[in-house]
């Protein structure tokens, strides 16, 4: 089962052009480092679970949760010692996506650079494919 939500803003971004890849999800070094930092304080959890939820003005929004186990239908991505699980409902939506972690003076958030997104809302929190 999944546990509490990860305390970070999740933003969908479609402006960046990515090279096609067969990987369901790739992580930037910044995302890997942040996930390691988050999990360091949660030794009972094995990784993060990424999902999509129906919400927002554009239809879909990403969700991130700590997880203690891999679900039967989850796809597992292991990169640089970090485990990220993708819920079945999100697998096709995330195909070829790069997960990044960005910090500036005003905010810090995970950013999904997703080549499949056809549009986002003004704030970038929700999207459609």
From Swiss-Prot:
Coiled-coil boundaries: none
Q: InterPro entries, alphabetically?
A: Fe-S_cluster_asmbl/transfer, FeS_biogenesis, FeS_cluster_insertion, FeS_cluster_insertion_CS, HesB-like_dom_sf
The answer to whether keyword Mitochondrion applies is: yes
Give the CC-aspect GO terms. Answer: mitochondrion
Major localization listed first in the record, in broad terms = mitochondrion
Kindly list the residue ranges recorded as spanning the membrane: none
Q: Which molecular function term from Gene Ontology is one that the record holds?
A: iron-sulfur cluster binding
Transit peptide feature range: 1-12
Sorted UniProt keywords: Iron, Iron-sulfur, Metal-binding, Mitochondrion, Transit peptide
UniProt-annotated binding residues for Fe cation: 57, 121, 123
**Cell compartments where the protein resides:** Mitochondrion
Key word Mitochondrion present in the record? yes
GO biological process assignments: iron-sulfur cluster assembly
Could you tell me what this protein does?
Answer: Involved in the maturation of mitochondrial 4Fe-4S proteins functioning late in the iron-sulfur cluster assembly pathway. Probably involved in the binding of an intermediate of Fe/S cluster assembly.
Subunit structure as annotated in this protein's UniProt entry: Interacts with CRY2, but not with CRY1 (in vitro).
Family indicated by similarity: Belongs to the HesB/IscA family.
The molecule here is called Iron-sulfur cluster assembly 1 homolog, mitochondrial
